[in-house]
């Protein structure tokens, strides 16, 4: 895999308002279950599990799985995924991921970009970014906006992650096999 791939899934744009409504419901459920922050509580749930009755989320997961397996066709993989449901002043600052791979799906990205140390992604609805987890990145607001910035973050783990992060793995209820 090169540094990253960027895929645009038109289906998200075509059904954006319905997906936003379903993810708001999922966010409310996550909060009712005692997870106060859907981003930082990523080990406590999997957004595709919370939203499992949704046909739209099924299609997004199916496409995401295809993208990941096209890049990583062999071996055991696990995926954790969470909902970033953020206000203008709550976007993520510089960070990286301990997982082998990381990505995000732009549902309602507002006027933002994701800045990596060596490149920048213009966040557009329907974009699915996928790359190695160690690349440091942050979200930059390009202008003030009202409403929520909504993306789905995901990490893909390999056998290596399970050998290196044994303690962490047993505390992670959001990680599922990616068949």
Model-identified regions with their sequence ranges:
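Non-heme Fe(II)/2-oxoglutarate
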Residues: 1-74, 91, 177-178
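A short glycine-rich, His/Asp/Glu-containing loop-to-beta-strand
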Residues: 70-85
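Short, conserved beta-strand element in jelly-roll/cupin
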Residues: 85-86, 96-112, 155
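Short beta-strand His + acidic residue motifs that chelate non-heme Fe in jelly-roll/DSBH
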Residues: 92-95, 136-145
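A short hydrophobic beta-strand segment most commonly corresponding to one strand
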Residues: 102-105, 145-162
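A short beta-strand-loop-beta hairpin characteristic of the jelly-roll/cupin
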Residues: 107-124, 140
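Conserved metal-binding segment of the jelly-roll/cupin
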Residues: 122-138
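Short, cationic low-complexity segments
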Residues: 171-179
């Amino acid at each position: 895999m090169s540094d990253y791939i960027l895929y645009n899934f038109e289906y998200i744009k075509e059904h954006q308002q319905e997906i936003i409504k379903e993810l708001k419901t999922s966010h409310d459920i996550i909060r009712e279950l005692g997870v106060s922050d859907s981003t930082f509580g990523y080990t406590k749930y999997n957004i595709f599990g919370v939203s499992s009755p949704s046909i739209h989320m099924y299609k997004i997961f199916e496409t995401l799985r295809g993208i990941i397996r096209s890049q990583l066709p062999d071996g055991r993989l696990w995926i954790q995924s969470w909902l970033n449901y953020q206000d203008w002043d709550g976007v993520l600052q510089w960070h990286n991921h301990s997982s082998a791979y990381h990505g995000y799906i732009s549902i309602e990205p507002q006027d933002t970009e994701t800045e990596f140390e060596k490149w920048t992604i213009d966040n557009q609805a329907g974009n699915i970014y996928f790359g190695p987890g160690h690349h440091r990145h942050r979200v930059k607001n390009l202008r003030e906006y009202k409403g929520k910035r909504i993306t789905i973050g995901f990490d893909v783990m390999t056998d290596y992650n399970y050998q290196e992060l044994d303690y962490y793995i047993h505390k992670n209820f959001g990680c599922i096999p990616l068949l």
